[in-house]
Amino acid sequence: DQPGDVKTHKQYDVNYLFFKI
């Protein structure tokens, strides 16, 4: 896993959470 991938994953998680709400 690359640092960039981790950042993207974190942002994706946030977007997913926001969308779920």
From Swiss-Prot:
Keyword Transport included in the entry's annotation: yes
Q: List all membrane-crossing ranges.
A: none
Q: State the superkingdom.
A: Eukaryota
Q: Which UniProt keywords apply?
A: Copper, Oxygen transport, Secreted, Transport
One of the entry's Gene Ontology molecular-function terms is: oxygen carrier activity
Q: Where in the cell is it found?
A: Secreted, Extracellular space
Q: Which GO CC annotations does the UniProt entry carry?
A: extracellular region
Q: Where is this protein chiefly located?
A: secreted
Q: In which tissues is it expressed?
A: Hemolymph.
**Function, please?**
Hemocyanins are copper-containing oxygen carriers occurring freely dissolved in the hemolymph of many mollusks and arthropods.
Q: What is stated as this protein's family in its record? A: Belongs to the tyrosinase family. Hemocyanin subfamily.
User: What is the designated name of this protein?
Assistant: Hemocyanin subunit 1
Natural source organism? Maja squinado (Mediterranean spider crab)
